[in-house]
Amino acid sequence: IPAPEDCYVDGVIEQTDVLAKAIKVVMDEHRFNANNVAFSISSPRLATKEVLIPNVKANKIDKLVQANATEYFPVNMDEYIIQYTVLEKVEDQGQEKIKLMVAAVPSEVVESYYGLAKALGLKVAFVDYAGNSSYQIMKQQIGPEVSLVIQVENDGTVINIFKDNVLQLQRNVPYGKSMLVNAV
């Protein structure tokens, strides 16, 4: 569904009612009914970073990530939501560590999606970031060789490098299809 003009700015849904109406029209046209919605967010304001942490139990990872978030991202953590994905266990200087992909997204970005769900009369099942959603699909589809996966989106490009089915690098580049179209 193409977003109506100026509804979506840097990942924030600015005109919830206009976008909700456009989505409802398409849902009605296709007789699509739902109770839940899952969002996969793409925003130039979303930051990701690979992080190595000590090998701790799974239930301790979140507290460790939250406690060290300001070291990963130099922003006011009161305005951000921090999430992570476990990539793999690695050995670093003779010690077993856990490699994570940590994401920081402004709370206002996530809250705008909850507002859209409310306007649509839907319950949010989960919110993910586009890089992780793509990672979950790609890791099942590529082999053990080094693979470069490039996702060109409207406002940005996500570059993923895999080795042995493990994400080694993921970067968001703020150049996408819209820039190419405008250049032509």
Model-found features: residue ranges?
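Short acidic/polar beta-strand-loop edge motifs in secreted extracellular
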Residues: V12-I13, I53, M101, R171
